[in-house]
């Protein structure tokens, strides 16, 4: 008899992740109920009809009748109904905890405020180049539980702070917290509360990859990996060497790759490459396979992506920059011949935008602010314009563009005030950029 057979388990949240929990727990012969606080949740049509479903609110009675609650990462454990269930002795976990209890192959775990998806995909490509049967999922692409159905020798998981809050059994082969900057401040008490959720990834890990430029990423107390390696521009195991005007990605004294041979560009991407290389080497991936992946990896959509170039003007879609730290990373070390036309705005999620002030208050940077928090962002630049929508901003700036200029969508905000997702925002930007011909 398995641990879930005949247990009363309530799954909160449908969508891809919720349905993966349903499929897995059905295979374990559990008695399942599903709750979704939305009236018409996505995935409702894929739920087997014999499974009880409650929508529109949290059903406290169902929660208290449960042996276990599997909570959606989108719902905070601090929610009163969940706290009531916890006080009554009901176990509350997430889908990643279910996965970790079942997985028998090594896991690489990646979290951080920015760069998670790029590093996760890089490690996946490096393992694939080495001939390893590897599955990638979690907060990216496929729900982790769905990977259990695949023939994998290795799992590479992108993990959000929300997922880590309800994960207790992760014993990863290698992990990293890439960086910690303000994000989801509408969910956490403060930056330290958010950071502690991220640091849970280090618990029981064999190797922790540390960002030497960000002490907030270092594990502490029970959340420390057994062994650590570091990455940074200088003074680290994995570092960036500059010699005769050229840059090289290094591990100790060995060249991983000249930066000009990597398909990813920009200092923030070089840090991502170093972190991914450290993780890959920690699980035994050889440098030749790592080099192959780095030469062929094209990057991910909506992440500092060149979507149009004409008449000497570059249009860059960085719609995935949904927080201040991500936009800071995009602007750091950016060299432009002409003007930078920076599109900022959306839902700031309660973040402090002041960190942007010094970076954007430059003679060559003009800010075009839009969306819910556009007015707040516009205050930080002496050269700013305010619009209701991104489209209005682009139509305004278009006639002013000259050769050498860059139009950069790196909004420092979530998109949900005006768009269905950051992808939709990026797609609209791309469409408007390509229309510029």
Curated annotation (Swiss-Prot):
Annotated residues for binding of ATP: 112-118
From the Swiss-Prot or TrEMBL record, state where the protein is found.
Cytoplasm
Question: Main site of residence?
Answer: cytoplasm
Q: Which UniProt keywords apply?
A: ATP-binding, Cell cycle, Cell division, Cell shape, Cell wall biogenesis/degradation, Cytoplasm, Ligase, Nucleotide-binding, Peptidoglycan synthesis
Question: From what superkingdom does this record's organism come?
Answer: Bacteria
One short Pfam family name for this protein? Answer: MurD-like_N
Pathway the protein acts in: Cell wall biogenesis; peptidoglycan biosynthesis
Enzyme Commission designation:
6.3.2.9
Enzyme's top EC category? ligase
Query: GO cellular component annotations, sorted alphabetically?
Result: cytoplasm
The residue stretches assigned to a coiled coil in this entry are none
In which family does this protein belong, per the annotation?
Answer: Belongs to the MurCDEF family.
Its job: Cell wall formation. Catalyzes the addition of glutamate to the nucleotide precursor UDP-N-acetylmuramoyl-L-alanine (UMA).
NCBIfam families assigned to the protein according to its UniProt record, in alphabetical order:
murD (TIGR01087)
Protein name, per record: UDP-N-acetylmuramoylalanine--D-glutamate ligase
The root-end lineage is: Bacteria, Pseudomonadati, Pseudomonadota, Gammaproteobacteria, Pasteurellales
């Amino acid at each position: 008899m398995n641990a879930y057979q005949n247990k009363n388990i309530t799954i909160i949240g449908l969508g891809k992740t919720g349905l993966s929990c349903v499929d897995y727990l059905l295979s374990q012969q559990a008695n399942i109920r599903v709750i979704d606080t939305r009236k018409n949740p996505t995935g409702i049509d894929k739920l087997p009809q014999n499974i009880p479903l409650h929508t529109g609110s949290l059903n406290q009675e169902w929660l208290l009748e449960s042996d276990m609650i599997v909570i959606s990462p989108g719902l905070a454990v601090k929610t009163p109904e969940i706290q009531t269930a916890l006080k009554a002795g009901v176990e509350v976990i997430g889908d990643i905890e279910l996965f970790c209890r079942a997985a028998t192959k090594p896991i690489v775990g990646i979290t951080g405020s920015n760069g998670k998806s790029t590093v996760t995909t890089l490690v996946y490509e490096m393992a694939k180049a080495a001939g390893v049967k590897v599955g990638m999922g979690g907060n990216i692409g496929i729900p982790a539980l769905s990977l259990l159905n695949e023939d994998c020798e290795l799992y590479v998981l992108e993990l959000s702070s929300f997922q880590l809050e309800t994960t207790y059994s992760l014993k990863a082969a290698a992990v990293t917290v890439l960086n910690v900057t303000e994000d989801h401040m509408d969910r956490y008490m403060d930056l330290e509360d958010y950071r502690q959720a991220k640091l849970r990834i280090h618990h029981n890990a064999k190797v922790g990859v540390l960002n030497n430029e960000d002490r907030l990423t270092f594990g502490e107390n029970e959340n420390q990996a057994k062994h650590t390696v570091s990455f940074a521009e200088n003074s680290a195991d994995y570092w960036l060497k500059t010699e005769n005007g050229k840059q090289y990605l290094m591990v100790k004294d060995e060249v991983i790759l000249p930066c000009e041979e990597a398909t990813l560009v920009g200092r923030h991407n070089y840090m991502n490459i170093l972190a991914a290389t450290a993780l890959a080497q920690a699980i035994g991936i050889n440098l030749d396979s790592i080099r192959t992946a780095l030469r062929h990896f094209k990057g991910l959509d909506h992440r500092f992506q060149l979507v149009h170039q004409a008449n000497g003007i570059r249009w860059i879609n960085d719609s995935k920059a949904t927080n201040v730290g991500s936009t800071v990373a995009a602007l750091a070390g950016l060299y432009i011949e002409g003007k930078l036309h920076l599109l900022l705005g959306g839902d700031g999620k309660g973040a402090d935008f002041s960190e942007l002030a010094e970076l954007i208050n430059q003679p060559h940077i003009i800010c075009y602010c839009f969306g819910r928090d556009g007015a707040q962002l516009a205050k930080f630049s002496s050269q700013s314009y305010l619009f209701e929508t991104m489209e209005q901003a682009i139509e305004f700036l278009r006639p002013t563009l000259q050769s050498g200029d860059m139009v950069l969508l790196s909004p420092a905000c979530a998109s949900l005030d005006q768009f269905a997702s950051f992808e939709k925002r990026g797609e609209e930007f791309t469409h408007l950029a390509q229309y510029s011909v």
